[in-house]
Structure formats: C-alpha cells, structure tokens
Amino acid sequence: AEETSMIISIDRWVLRQACQQIQTWNQMYSPDPALSVNVNISAKHIVSQELREFLIEVLTETGLEPDSLKLEITEFSIVDHSDITAAAFTRLKELGVQIQIDDFGIGYSSLGYLSNFPINALKIDRSFVNDIIEDTGQRDIVEAIIALTKRLNVQVIAEGVETPEQLAKLRELGCKLGQGFFLSTPLDGPHAEQLITQIKFGTGMLPALEPKEN
C-alpha cells in the first residue's frame, strides 16, 4: 500500500478514527492535560496538497484541538523522498498540529533538515535504546541525540523501553518521554479507556509516572 495511492486512503481512515476516539475520551473524562494521539503518516500523504484540507475537515468534524494531533513520519521517508520539503511541513504546522520524526538515527541523512523543517519532536529509534545499558557507544549516541534536541528546543522520545534499567538510564540522560512494553503493552479501545479511568481517579499509574523508591 505504501507504494500506491491506497496508502492515502488508509492514512485518512486511521486519522479520522483516531481523532474521533481521542476526542470522545477527552469529552468523557476531561483529562488535564487533554489526551493527544500520535498517527503515523506516509511520505506520499505528507506531500499531498489535499492533506491540509483533510485535516481541517477532520479537526472541525471531531472538535479535537489541533495540538492534540501528532503526525509521525519516519526519518527514512524523509531521506527516501526528496519531494518532502519544509514547505510541506509548514503547511501542516500552520494548522497547529505537531510533527514528530520517527525512528530517528537510522536514516543516514544529513542533519541539515532538522534546522530547516518545523518539527516538534524526535523519537530515538529502539535500536539505540536496546543496548543502552551494556553498549557505551549506543549510550553516547542517545546522549548526543538528547543534547541535540535540547539545542533545537524540541521534545525527545525514546522508543522501545522494555526494562526498568533502560528507563532509569534514559531519565539520567535527560529523556523524560518514552514508549515501550515496560511502560505499556499495546491496548485495544476498552483497555485503553480502563487505563484512562484508573489514572484519572488515582487508582492506576504507568511505570514512568510512578514515584521512585527512596
């Protein structure tokens, strides 16, 4: 589907469903801050002239605040599609949606695009997080990426956090956001709603939010 126009139809279906579900939960539970949703989007769709209009339609239809929608595009897609330009990203940022670079660090690309593209966050590829405890080289790369995001004033998110040791090391290096099986396994709608309810009423917490032991 990635190589055909079918991917745009798939992207649109996922975007609409995700925005509708997140806004439903925001209205039901009034979390503070409001829930946001990350949606992976194809390079073919990013450069589409119709994407901006479609997002306006979906955000208006669902009532979701634009900054609650975070579009993810892989670094490899940026490298592999020279027609992805800063202008394409700017068209989306003007709506108020956020843009995140997924799988950062494995694209073998020039870092020049980081200063030219209006992005909100970098997501450190899981391949660097996997060996962050044993491999000092990988740890140095993660630390360098974190330092880079601070200089660029964008968020940094670690992918593939699967152990408490990895989480502790990432915290030590200054990374405050992460995703992975240690934090939560993938959840379907009912189980995600149950977790939202537990967190709202103080009966459940994610590992990343639990207070550290003294």
Where are the model-predicted features located?
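Regular, well-ordered alpha-helical segments
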Residues: Q23-Q27, E94, E172
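EAL-family c-di-GMP phosphodiesterase catalytic domain
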Residues: N40-Q49, S68-D83, L95-N214
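Conserved functional hotspot residues or short segments at active or partner-binding sites
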Residues: A88
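Small residues (Ala/Gly/Ser/Thr
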Residues: A1, A18, G178-G180
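Catalytic core of bacterial c-di-GMP phosphodiesterases, primarily the EAL and HD-GYP domains
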Residues: M6-T85, G160
